[in-house]
Regions:
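Phosphate-binding site recognition
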Residues: 2-343
Length: 343
């Protein structure tokens, strides 16, 4: 038995260090299908379903795996998913949960990362474009035999951008998906706060808050076709400003114990990654440079830094660590709001 255990260990290590390191790749399906190294965060699925909040907002710093986790949730819940993507991952051991929920829901997925503009009108157009792309992803509704003629006409208008009621667009798409599938909808909204940050920078914050409040109010509050929703962002914007009246609304931040290990890398995960690539002797450097965060009860490393450092070590075992995160996206948003509050 010991011989087989050792053999299995070396086989796993060999397979791991032949995997590519996913620098900048935030698509779960791409990582799993194209042979990239993946640190398993699928326990988040189990935690969400066992906690079952109607609307959950996760706030974490930039470059901590929020978008990848949202992509993972989409791949798990969406009808028609490739279930083999989850083979060998934590969640696959919970067979009952997988049987009940994997590939069982229509999903609306929006990333608001690209919503920006020097004035409100251009930012609103960008938001409309992002919503239009998601509507187009569900093009099959145009010829659905389940929908009525009136429903299909409405969808065609939405598809061609002829329905200018942007605030009701997500709820309306939810309704059509529900009627088509006979199943309530999962809504995933990534980087929800980016439009507000860009608006704050460019002087149209009040207008954008009003628009987002209306959009979220229809999609998350008065939406009878909603199964549950998950949002991510860097900041917790005041509930009174855009989440007014939402029932069963949960905010999970860096001080909360729940989900504290699901965004960012734990100490054990970093050690295993370096061991898998035969660079375990550089663990002290990784810990000194990148173990600077404490979420809930967990010490957490910035994934962006760790992955970039590991990639450098693969080609150059003596590579020096550096602050990769500073050269990527930063958290300027936080500083701007703090500076404004101090004035």
């Amino acid at each position: 038995i010991l011989v087989f255990s050792i053999a299995d260990y070396f086989l796993e290590a060999f397979m791991a260090n032949t995997l590519k390191l996913p620098v900048g790749i935030e698509n779960f399906e791409e990582i799993r299908k194209l042979g990239f190294y993946y640190i398993d965060k699928t326990r988040l699925i189990e935690q969400l379903l066992q906690g079952w909040g109607k609307v959950t907002l996760f706030t974490r710093p930039r470059r901590f795996g929020k978008t990848l986790n949202m992509s993972m949730l989409k791949s798990f819940f969406e009808i028609g998913t490739d279930k083999t993507l989850f083979d060998g991952l934590y969640i696959s051991d919970n067979k009952e949960l997988c049987d009940d929920h994997m590939g069982k829901y229509p999903v609306i997925f929006l990333s608001l990362k690209g919503v920006e503009g020097l004035e409100f009108a251009s930012a609103k157009r960008m938001l409309c474009t992002i919503i239009d792309r998601e509507i187009d992803r569900h093009y099959y509704l145009k010829t659905s035999d389940v929908l009525t003629d009136e429903d299909r006409t409405l969808f065609t208008k939405m598809l061609h951008g002829q329905d200018d009621n942007i605030e009701d667009s997500i709820r309306m798409l939810s309704k059509l998906l529900y009627k088509h599938y006979g199943q309530k909808v999962v809504i995933l909204i990534d980087e929800y706060d980016v439009p507000l940050d860009k608006a704050f920078q460019n002087g149209y914050y009040k207008e954008m808050v009003s628009l987002i409040r209306g959009l979220f109010g229809q999609a998350l509050k008065t939406n009878e076709f909603l199964q549950f929703a998950v949002l991510t962002g860097c900041l917790r914007v005041s509930k009174e400003s855009i989440f007014t009246g939402l029932n069963n609304f949960e905010i999970n931040s860096i001080v909360d114990i729940d989900h504290d290990e699901q965004f960012g890398f734990t100490d054990d995960e970093v050690m295993k990654l370096l061991l898998d690539y035969d660079r375990s002797e550089r663990y002290p450097d990784a810990k000194e440079w990148y173990d600077g965060y404490h979420f809930g009860n967990a010490d957490i490393y910035c994934p962006w830094d760790v992955i970039n450092f590991a990639k450098k070590l693969v080609s150059d075992p003596s590579a020096r660590p550096s602050a990769f995160w500073i050269n990527s996206s930063g958290n300027d948003m936080v500083k701007r709001f703090v500076d404004k509050a101090d004035q």
